[in-house]
Regions:
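Conserved small/polar residues in nucleotide/adenosyl-binding loops
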Residues: 200-202
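Fe(II)/2-oxoglutarate oxygenase catalytic core
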Residues: 1-114, 121-124, 160-170, 189-190, ...
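Conserved metal-binding segment of the jelly-roll/cupin
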Residues: 170-185
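Catalytic core of non-heme Fe(II) oxygenases with the double-stranded beta-helix
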Residues: 109-114, 119-172
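A generic structural signal for short, solvent-exposed coil/turn residues
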Residues: 39, 105, 133, 147-149, ...
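Low-complexity, flexible helical/coil segments
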Residues: 148-151, 176-180, 191-194
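Conserved hydrophobic/aromatic beta-strand scaffold that supports enzyme active sites
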Residues: 46, 140-142, 176-178
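Short amphipathic alpha-helical leader/targeting segments
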Residues: 155, 188-189
Length: 202
């Protein structure tokens, strides 16, 4: 079935230098006061990608309607912005260029970036509390940025909300899955710690 997915699913990988540059910033993500804020640590920024450059638009509020997000729909969520050195890094520019080229985005396209780390604070921690879902965009990218002391967290993709997943994979360091969010649904398996009382995150 994957031969029918050329335009809806693309798999690639960041350069080793981009991963090495970006990965340390994921250890400095803040908790939030939102419903998932104790285990989904996050920064969020909206940028414009123009002439190959990342331009910070200083937008840090995010909302999804409840028909898209059954967990936190119709809630305006304010997040701390992605730190300037990270946002202006060559690694972030590489991500945006990759995303723009793969999806044939117009020059100057706005791109919303969620920088997130998920900690296994429960026996089983839900990576995606909303379950099988879409995010409300035409295109999205999921990028693996490191795993420590966890199992689970497999990305699962679906052709429709009620079908079994046709794709399942743990995204390893720097691996990128780009998908047509308006055509596919996604979810992830829960994560759990391998060694208790040790630092855990994905």
């Amino acid at each position: 079935m994957l031969h029918n997915r050329e335009t809806t699913l693309q798999l690639t990988k960041l350069s080793d230098s981009a991963f090495a540059q970006l990965a340390p910033s994921f250890t400095k993500l803040p908790n939030t006061e939102h419903a998932d804020g104790k285990f989904r640590l996050r920064r969020y920024s909206v940028i414009q990608f123009k002439d190959g450059q990342v331009i910070d638009l200083q937008k840090n509020e995010f909302m999804q309607t409840d028909d898209i997000n059954r967990f936190q729909g119709n809630v305006v969520r304010q997040f701390e912005p992605i730190e300037t050195p990270t946002l202006q890094s060559e690694g972030m520019r590489e991500i945006c260029q990759l995303f723009a080229d793969a999806n044939k985005l117009a020059d100057g396209q706005e791109i919303e970036i969620h920088q997130m780390r998920i900690s296994a604070i429960f026996d089983e921690t839900q990576v995606a509390p909303e379950g099988v879902h879409q995010d409300g965009f035409e295109h999205i990218a999921l990028i693996g940025m490191g795993r420590h002391n966890i199992e689970g967290g497999d990305v699962m993709l679906y052709s429709s909300f009620n079908e079994a997943p046709f794709f399942r994979k743990v995204l390893q360091n720097g691996e990128v899955a780009m998908l047509a969010d308006n055509k596919l649904w996604h979810n992830a398996t829960p994560i759990r710690s391998v060694i208790e009382l040790s630092l855990i995150h994905i």
